Design a protein with these regions (language model features):
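Conserved beta-strand-loop-beta-strand hairpin that lines the nucleotide-binding pocket
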Residues: 1-8, 51-135
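STAS-typified acidic loop motif
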Residues: 4, 9-20
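Alpha-helix initiation/capping motif
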Residues: 10, 14, 32, 95-96
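Conserved short strand/loop->alpha-helix "switch" segment adjacent to the catalytic nucleotide/phosphoryl-transfer site
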Residues: 22-44
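Histidine-centered phosphotransfer motif of kinases
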Residues: 38-56
Length: 135
């Protein structure tokens, strides 16, 4: 019988916090015996977006990882900028743009992704992907 695993951490809304989110997610998934390569990329993009678009001085962002009994990994990154939500359908940036591809990557790697608002002033950007136990 499968059980649900969950991990939650508050991190500084800085580039260092985003990097730590990626490293912690990799180690947590590894400790649960779950694949981490794809999830690590998704966490990196969502955490970077929280730092870049959801930053409020002195406030943190929260990373939550949950593996359900059906072997689905849900990645959630919560910040305090509900007034800055990502588009439901990410659009490709200009060819010469240096950024703007993160949500396109998340959409390509995840089975599903979206945004939940609340509690005020927060928003959570989430993604779900398969996480079968490693053999």
């Amino acid at each position: 019988m499968n059980q649900e695993n969950s991990f939650k951490v508050l991190l500084s809304a800085t580039r260092r916090g985003a990097r730590l989110a990626r490293l912690l997610s990799r180690e947590q998934l590894r400790s649960w015996g779950r694949p981490f390569e794809t999830a690590e990329h998704v966490v990196a993009e969502l955490a970077n977006n929280a730092v870049q678009h959801g930053h409020v001085p002195g406030r943190s962002f929260r990373l939550t990882l949950t593996v359900s009994a059906t072997d689905t990994l849900r990645i959630e990154v919560t910040d305090v900028r509900a007034d800055r939500t990502p588009p439901a359908e990410p659009r490709p940036p200009a060819p010469d743009a240096e950024g703007g591809r993160g949500l396109l990557l998340v959409a390509a790697l995840a089975d599903r992704w979206g945004t939940d608002l609340g509690p005020v002033p927060c928003k959570t950007v989430w993604a779900e992907l398969p996480a079968p136990p490693s053999r």
